[in-house]
Design a protein with these regions (language model features):
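Conserved ABC transporter NBD signature motif
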Residues: 63-74
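Short catalytic/signature loops enriched in Gly
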Residues: 19, 60, 141-147, 235-320
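Conserved ABC ATPase signature
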Residues: 149-154, 158
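P-loop NTP-binding/switch modules centered on Walker-like glycine-rich loops
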Residues: 41, 55, 172, 176, ...
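A short, flexible loop at the N-terminus of ABC-type nucleotide-binding domains that lies
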Residues: 3, 12-25, 56-62, 79-83, ...
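Hydrophobic anchor residue at the start of the ABC signature
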Residues: 112, 164, 188, 192
Length: 320
């Protein structure tokens, strides 16, 4: 049994301009110890997927269909109190911008200690020592002193390390990392990614990595799911995505990557724009931008089929 199985997930936002189908029938699974990358353009539904799993979708959004199974236990059936016990202890999340995720009026150590006590009990002193230990494990220098600091007193890189320490302190089985290094400079970004890789290997936990950066995926992930306009269009082991991409959208994304062999040449781009999810009709949502689209692509929604062992693609046109 997979650690996490998402089946037919649909999350919608009711707005004055219509219903936004941000996540529209997503299905995927994550095995224990696996790192799965969820990749796509801004606005494709990556972060809404993670918030749906955590049951943190803000109003006016709501999950309208599907199942989210954690060890076979459907999270959508849990009440608010039961879900609070799941968050942190079994699933934790590292947010893209820790300055808005951390509480500005409590010290870093107090926030980590509070998470430890909420899920494991124990006294204040033991929880504080655990907080210092976690800051040390994520390579925060002078962890005992930094534990007394407030979020605004730390640099962006140290805040992200503190956010990781807070997420991992209760020992979750699954970590959701939503663009964990996007807001950081390149050097600090590399350090954070290396830290995540080491912690994942040491703890053997599963990770859902949400990103638009294919370079990050190549470094960290075992498998990758490519999402477009709220639907998964391709899913495969990471090496297969880079070496033998099948879906036209995946191929387009890879062509957009800068490469030394194309120095001095214009960067490639995917023509057109993503669809308005309030008006997305039948058929493949990439069809208006796809150079291979047939009339049937605009009419019929393609199924995500296994074309090769472990390699799934939602496109009737591509051949293998």
């Amino acid at each position: 049994m997979a650690l996490l199985a998402v089946e037919g997930l649909r999350t919608q936002f009711a707005t004055s301009g219509g219903t936004v189908r941000a996540v529209d029938g997503l299905s995927f699974a994550i095995e224990r110890g696996e790192v799965l990358g969820l990749v796509g353009e801004s606005g494709c539904g990556k972060s809404v997927t993670s918030l749906s799993i955590m049951r943190l979708v803000p109003p006016p959004g709501r999950v309208t269909a599907g199942r989210i199974l954690l060890d076979g236990d459907d999270l959508l059936d849990k009440d608010a109190e039961a879900m609070r016990r799941v968050r942190g202890a079994r699933i934790a999340m590292v947010f893209q911008e820790p300055m808005t995720a951390l509480n500005p009026v409590f010290s870093i150590g107090d926030q980590i200690a509070a998470a430890v006590r909420a899920h494991e009990g124990g006294g204040r002193r033991a929880a504080w020592e655990r907080a210092v230990e976690m800051l040390d494990r994520v390579q925060v220098p002078s962890p005992r002193e930094r534990a007394r600091d407030y979020p605004h007193q730390l640099s962006g890189g140290l805040r992200q390390r503190a956010m990781i320490a807070l997420a991992l302190a209760p020992g979750p089985q699954l970590l959701i990392a939503d663009e964990p290094a996007t807001a950081l400079d390149v050097t600090i970004q590399a350090q954070i990614l290396d830290l995540l890789r080491r912690l994942q290997a040491d703890r053997g936990m599963a990770v859902l990595l949400i990103t638009h950066d294919l370079g990050v995926v190549a470094e960290l992930c075992h498998r990758v799911a490519i999402i477009y306009a709220g639907r998964i269009v391709e899913m495969a082991p990471v090496a297969k995505i880079f070496e033998e991409p099948l879906h036209p959208y995946t191929r387009g994304l890879l062509r957009c990557l800068p490469h030394p062999s194309r120095f001095g040449q214009p960067l490639s781009s995917i023509e057109g724009a993503p669809p308005d999810l309030r008006q997305a009709g039948a058929g493949c949502r990439f069809a208006p931008r796809c150079p291979l689209a047939l009339e049937s692509c605009r009419r019929d929604e393609p199924a995500l089929d296994e074309r090769r062992p472990g390699h799934f693609v939602a496109c009737p046109v591509v051949s293998v």
